[in-house]
Amino acid sequence: MAYSYTEKKRIRKDFSKLPDVMDVPYLLAIQLDSYREFLQAGASKDQFRDVGLHAAFKSVFPIISYSGNAALEYVGYRLGEPAFDVKECVLRGVTFAVPLRVKVRLIIFDKESSNKAIKDIKEQEVYMGEIPLMTENGTFVINGTERVIVSQLHRSPGVFFDHDRGKTHSSGKLLYSARIIPYRGSWLDFEFDPKDCVFVRIDRRRKLPASVLLRALGYSTEEVLNTFYTTNVFHLSGEKLSLELVPQRLRGEVAVMDIHDGSGKVIVEQGRRITARHINQLEKAGVKELDVPLEYVLGRTTAKAIVHPATGEILAECNTELTTDLLVKIAKAQVVRIETLYTNDIDCGPFISDTLKIDTTSNQLEALVEIYRMMRPGEPPTKDAAETLFNNLFFSAERYDLSAVGRMKFNRRIGRTEIEGSGVLSKEDIVEVLKTLVDIRNGKGIVDDIDHLGNRRVRCVGEMAENQFRVGLVRVERAVKERLSMAESEGLMPQDLINAKPVAAAVKEFFGSSQLSQFMGQNNPLSEITHKRRVSALGPGGLTRERAGFEVRDVHPTHYGRVCPIETPEGPNIGLINSLAAYARTNQYGFLESPYRVVKEGVVSDDIVFLSAIEEADHVIAQASAAMNEKKQLIDELVAVRHLNEFTVKAPEDVTLMDVSPKQVVSVAASLIPFLEHDDANRALMGSNMQRQAVPTLRADKPLVGTGMERNVARDSGVCVVARRGGVIDSVDASRIVVRVADDEVETGEAGVDIYNLTKYTRSNQNTCINQRPLVSKGDVVARGDIMADGPSTDMGELALGQNMRIAFMAWNGFNFEDSICLSERVVQEDRFTTIHIQELTCVARDTKLGPEEITADIPNVGEAALNKLDEAGIVYVGAEVGAGDILVGKVTPKGETQLTPEEKLLRAIFGEKASDVKDTSLRVPTGTKGTVIDVQVFTRDGVERDSRALAIEKMQLDEIRKDLNEEFRIVEGATFERLRAALNGQVVDGGAGLKKGTVITDDVLNGLEHGQWFKLRMAEDALNEQLEKAQQYIVDRRRLLDDKFEDKKRKLQQGDDLAPGVLKIVKVYLAIRRRIQPGDKMAGRHGNKGVVSVIMPVEDMPHDANGTPVDVVLNPLGVPSRMNVGQILETHLGLAAKGLGEKIDRMIEEQRKAAELRTFLTEIYNEIGGRQENLEEFTDEEIMALANNLKKGVPMATPVFDGAKEREIKAMLKLADLPESGQMQLFDGRTGNKFERSVTVGYMYMLKLNHLVDDKMHARSTGSYSLVTQQPLGGKAQFGGQRFGEMEVWALEAYGAAYTLQEMLTVKSDDVNGRTKMYKNIVDGDHRMEPGMPESFNVLIKEIRSLGIDIDLETE
């Protein structure tokens, strides 16, 4: 296998046994693909596919005026260029977006002509607002902050059949219902009531009998009965009644008389129940008619109206119950044929017939009116209004759309074969749904499982943005329609008709404040990736936390390979917010698909198919770990498989598919937990959630025990710098990498230079630090896709969230009681868990009513000492160390409380005494913060003079840009001259540049000429002269292009900033705060084993082994058995082996062993103990030495999820490292030197420091703000609040009889306003007495009682 630049430097020993059939797909594809589809940015107008923006425009246009004399058609759209790049947008606090220009055509028809002749056509491009662009990492920059649009898992449009699980009626009877859910439009529900009549609801309003809807559709009672029922035909002749016999229909009935065959033999005796055997005999005997007594027909329902043969009078309407009187009447009239409905209690209930009986309407108009009354109660119905309303409900494409998905699901559910069709409902659709519902009630067919992933689909960014855009366009449409009628008379252009504000507002609202547009979690690369791959059931059109029951949240069999069963938040959102599985993707309909290998007749092929939950149901799917031989045949007699959403076993020849990888079940975060298969699910959930909260440490340290997914996450997250094209590193420093691109990757006419500017010490959304460090050195050769620089939490291109710590599992002096963690001081000294946090503090100078605020170093009543870190503009220097309360930006605000007399005004004007009329409103460092100023940004409004600091910053930025462009030019020029040198060498000169005719060009000759003179050479060959001219022209063009680029950037920098109204200047100061680990910080492993640091002990007191090596962390062994996360123990053992092997390699290098010996030892590590074979033969000796040097701190191992290291392999590794195979060793107490009485598990575990730091939570209050009504101190750190002294705490003091302490708590320390002021004064005077008064809460109580209308007063004696 080929190794990338970074992989070669440090290979992970991989324990996986199963082959890699398929690489993990690009992890951010779900976001990027969806939005690319929405914008279709590169497409020309004939290439537009009917999706995204294009589809939204087509669904609203053409807009036709009310009179029909003018129409506005849509032609196409184009996207402009963004004004700023992503970094500039973040800095300036603006949205990263492009202008959208739509080409529309206004057509005006001739009123006079009868055939709508076209009178005038105008085409014009109209600006339709800005559309946010997605960055290459799948985020949006909205108002300067990075946001992610989370995908939504919602109920797919279509038709669903369900029952109430017996909860509605006290009898526990199942009431069935059907619901047609469109993509947009009214919902249509059919439901049974306890009396078995069918009702319909539109948009969950009051219910009507379902027959009302059928009548409104134009069906008569007879047509309805014909559609839903078959009939029994009776012949009447005199007193005799005979039935046309269909034997099957008699099954289960009790014979009312003896039934004979043709020969008079009795087949069924009277009073016996008719069984299948009897029916067979009847069919054999060929009985076609059966004489029945008259009572047999009583109580049956007529299927057609019964008409008097002579007079034509209707004796009985259809759907009438036959009674004795009616039968007499019919017999008198000599009717010979009666048709009745065939119903029974088993599989053909009389539900529709009963519904028709309770229906009060009798024709279509009455039904329409009834529906109108239900939808618009209180409005007088007219025929037209009722018809229009009904048609608009389900049959108008403007108001109703099932969408392609909905139509496909609808047709499949009601048993049609075609999957395409109209977006609106038809009569047949509604009847088919009712038929299916009645069938289910009759016991044919089953209800749907709403939590099945075949019934829930994912709405991604693109689709949601399209919906919002359509909403905006519909708002525009109304306004355009009204203006269109004026278009002709006033000669308006399309520009005048369309107001883009509603569209822009709808888009802005969606990206800025939708529930699914979220502030991106940016603690570390994993939290970014997970956030982008999140799937939420909440949000507009989704569920709400309160209403979501247990079933929706639970893991469903169809989640397998689509949604992770482990990763979901704890708390109220559990199960509603999920994560995509590692290999999952969405199909064209938005259903989640998982990949499978195709299996034919027990042989596994390498073909891969992606299947949705519906398609997979009928397949027999083997596990990825199913045993195979070399010919890829399944060899077990019975293979463990999934079939029909159940786990079972089948013979190999029955298997049709096989999983591609064991980790396809879990999400990215869960697949980063080694030995996940040995952890309890609850703890694995915590483990995957806590990895997202890890803070990037100062020096990232790769996990010794990983899973092999680390590299994928680091690469796909976008925090590393990945080579866009291969080439040679031309120059590299801390802030940029310049690559001279390989010739075969340079397209003609473009520069063969890639410049990568690294991000240095930038603030993330969570205030952690984003910093990139180069991995390459000058002259290195890199290929496309190689990682050239590490980002936060990455180490040599691998995700590195924490640090490898030497841990011991032992109880130790109670310091690790209840999940506490005991740390060694060495961890602090080596800065293992030191993190950098960057805080952005902003100072805004506004224009106030009393005059403008000013940013200045001239602040009233502030000593020199406080100003020594400010420059002359009043802004702090970069590099200054500042603490709480220090001034960062000096700002004064005019104050105008005092009214000045005219005399005073005059004196002010003459002597300019300014200090008294401004107040100090400087930006100061908040309490509890100290750090270093690492950057300052100044933004000035257009037209306001820029201060010296702003100009200095601008100059610095311009120098950076110029440096980049010059570098690019230098390399382009160098490459051009290199090519010329190769072409000219050994050629003959014709003159020019001071050379004689006939001179042969050599390197020396060329070195003697300046570059400018090369172009003056006239060569003997014309082709060479042409090449020289082209090269000269190319260099001139390139220079001009770069100069234009520079001017463009300069213009952007020098134009004023677009600030909010009333803001003159904004200064942003960035503070870097260094936080060491300290007691109170939260730490965790990757297995949900979390704890708080309780104590940091001196190194010499920590337990140590026989060699004197102390442990770094002591964990409590009691935290393991009850929580069942044994993975941490296995990780500890394997970590010990990894470290031991590293130390062994280190000793070999120190002893200066030969490369061959190292190669042998490395081969033993990588290729002799289980897992994947590494190809070390292709490495040169230098590469082997480089590899060995990178392994000195430990050989990193990968134990993939569900396919990891076995116990025997861990033991073999420990043995190879010359360590005890038990993984336990004898420890000594550092304080006494005594042995502990039994050996202790010691090893290396990967520990994370979580973003729950004691510094952010700890807080102390002296005096501060008070609540307005109760006059009690506020609560919480943000409000600088006090400590709550609640009811139970009062009881505690009462119990101790501490009366004076209690009095103090309830009065002067709380809400006794006068008492606390007095006390403050007393303390200032050195007098520590207190005089409690009346607490304010007493006055509040009195006011509350008075508000009840009771007059109450406090009487004082």
Curated annotation (Swiss-Prot):
InterPro entries: DNA-dir_RNA_pol_bsu_ext_1_sf, DNA-dir_RNA_pol_bsu_external_1, DNA-dir_RNA_pol_su2, DNA-dir_RNAP_su2_dom, DNA-dir_RNAP_su2_hyb_sf, RNA_pol_bsu_bac, RNA_pol_bsu_CS, RNA_pol_bsu_protrusion. Its EC number is 2.7.7.6. Keywords: DNA-directed RNA polymerase, Nucleotidyltransferase, Transcription, Transferase. One of its GO terms (cellular component) is DNA-directed RNA polymerase complex. The keyword Oxidoreductase does not apply. One of its GO terms (molecular function) is ribonucleoside binding. It catalyses: RNA(n) + a ribonucleoside 5'-triphosphate = RNA(n+1) + diphosphate. Pfam families: RNA_pol_Rpb2_1 (PF04563), RNA_pol_Rpb2_2 (PF04561), RNA_pol_Rpb2_3 (PF04565), RNA_pol_Rpb2_45 (PF10385), RNA_pol_Rpb2_6 (PF00562), RNA_pol_Rpb2_7 (PF04560). One of its GO terms (biological process) is DNA-templated transcription. NCBIfam families: PRK00405.1, rpoB. DNA-dependent RNA polymerase catalyzes the transcription of DNA into RNA using the four ribonucleoside triphosphates as substrates. Belongs to the RNA polymerase beta chain family. The RNAP catalytic core consists of 2 alpha, 1 beta, 1 beta' and 1 omega subunit. When a sigma factor is associated with the core the holoenzyme is formed, which can initiate transcription. This is DNA-directed RNA polymerase subunit beta. It comes from Pseudomonas entomophila (strain L48).
